[in-house]
Design a protein with these regions (language model features):
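C-terminal regulatory/interaction module of P-loop NTP-utilizing enzymes
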Residues: 1-344
Length: 344
């Protein structure tokens, strides 16, 4: 495969390849602005060692398969979300951290999805109750935190104090470089969320009605972001400039609507092979652990042919059996590497 077009190469070593990313296709060109600087908190990668391994060496990292590289780079070029499907423990979430690390795109914004998650959770939250309490306190009203009238008076804080952008909302701020957003386990959502995402993913923007209502008097409002920093929202709308690199993960437990699928680049991950598992163990636990855990890796591979097991179970087993006596090693491995699809 000709690698000249690749922005993300899967080499594990940070570089400035993102600067060579061509302009987006006309139908995915966004003009949000003025450009927002993410700030130091967004630039800090945080838990890279925990996600990718404290013992990793660039030369030893497993190079992604050609299909993975093509899908990731297609998503980068086309400014489309990447829908990654695979069994638990196949490295779906790790892809987001790997791309952010190699392309120096800062902290991964993570949006974990559960059955009660709604679109609003990802965009922003407005704490109307806290604002009402502050208004009452500032005016010395009778309802001020249970106090008597006149207990406190003063200026009411601006509305921006009560608005915090969620992971998706923060990713859509008009930054010069794309942010990385991980929407984890989208298949756990209720039936509406995938459809609710369509317009935001297509348009790269969303409105904050609470700020639109005051835009005539407060055209610029400073709000909190998911990074814990502040950003200015203008005219009550957030519109991206560099469309974020978005990874949607799924364990394959449900089908998604065609309208979402056609807006995504799709990638299916299979179970990792022996070489990839050994590299993973080496990256997280070191060379000696990978050498001593060879039998566990082979046992794990054997089980994965007929049972649903996850790679993090293997890491747990290699780590714990390193400290256990040989007599209990096999029992611990059986305890920790249990099939995930067994009848309950």
């Amino acid at each position: 495969m000709n690698d000249d077009w690749l922005i993300y190469r899967g080499i594990g070593e940070p570089h400035d390849g993102i600067d060579a990313l061509p302009d987006p296709p006309p139908w995915r060109d966004f003009d949000g602005g003025p450009v927002v600087e993410p700030g130091p908190a967004a630039a800090a990668e945080g838990n890279v060692a925990r996600r990718l391994g404290a013992h990793r060496q660039a030369a030893e990292l497993h190079r992604p398969e050609a299909e993975e590289l093509e899908a990731i780079n297609a998503a980068l070029y086309l400014r489309r979300p990447l829908l990654v499907t695979g069994f638990p423990g196949t490295g779906k979430s790790t892809l987001a951290h790997s791309v952010a690390h190699e392309l120096k795109l800062g902290r991964v914004l993570r949006w974990p999805v559960v059955s009660r998650t709604v679109l609003q959770d990802g965009l922003y939250r407005y704490d109307a109750l806290a604002r009402l309490q502050d208004v009452q306190l500032a005016s010395g009203g009778a309802g001020a935190a249970g106090g008597a009238p006149g207990t406190r008076s003063g200026a009411v804080p601006g509305i921006g104090k009560y608005i915090r952008l969620g992971p998706l909302g923060t990713a859509l701020l008009p930054t010069a470089r794309p942010r990385v957003l991980l929407v984890d386990e989208l298949d756990k959502s209720d039936i509406d969320l995938p459809n609710d995402l369509l317009n935001v993913l297509e348009e790269g923007e969303f409105a904050l009605p609470e700020l639109e209502r005051v835009a005539d008097t407060e055209p610029e409002v400073e709000v909190l972001t998911d990074d814990g920093t502040k950003a200015t929202v203008r005219g009550g709308r957030v519109r991206c400039r560099a469309f974020p690199f978005i990874i949607l993960t799924s364990n394959g437990e449900r089908d998604f609507p065609a309208a979402l699928l056609r807006r995504c680049i799709q990638l299916k991950l299979g179970q990792p092979g022996e070489k990839r598992l050994a590299t993973m163990v080496r990256a997280h636990l070191g060379e000696e652990a990978a050498r001593l855990g060879g039998d566990l890796i082979r046992e794990f591979l054997g089980r994965s042919q007929s049972e649903l097991v996850a790679a993090d179970q293997l890491l747990n087993a290699v780590y714990l059996t390193h400290y256990a006596s040989p007599a209990t090693r096999e029992d611990l491995a059986d305890l920790l590497i249990q099939r995930l699809d067994r009848p309950r």
